């Protein structure tokens, strides 16, 4: 009987210890944690923003071949359905490579 009471007390202590809710885990105590766009843009300097835009434009111009093929396949519904089953490479080869060879 004593061991059962001791086990119950230990279990209660374990529950209290493990289920303790820490206030440190709360995201924010602030009333309004969001900031407006003007203040948010202060974090990134104009030069970094310009550099990011230039890099994005370069990536748009020089896309990999498989990405261009996938975009072409996404525009054609039958190719897109075929790609869901067999993959984009097989779908592109079926619907677009044959047309190039026929020319």
Swiss-Prot record:
One of its GO terms (molecular function) is calcium ion binding. Belongs to the osteocalcin/matrix Gla protein family. Residues 51-97 form the Gla domain. Requires vitamin K-dependent gamma-carboxylation for its function. It comes from Pongo abelii. The lineage of its organism: Eukaryota, Metazoa, Chordata, Craniata, Vertebrata. Associates with the organic matrix of bone and cartilage. Thought to act as an inhibitor of bone formation. GO terms for cellular component: extracellular matrix; extracellular region. It is found in: Secreted. The keyword Phosphoprotein applies. The modification 4-carboxyglutamate is found at residues 21, 56, 60, 67, 71. GO terms for biological process: cartilage development; cell differentiation; ossification; regulation of bone mineralization. It comes from the Eukaryota. This is Matrix Gla protein. InterPro entries: GLA-like_dom_SF, GLA_domain, MGP, Osteocalcin/MGP. Its main location: secreted. Residues 1-19 form the signal peptide. Disulfide bonds join 73-79.
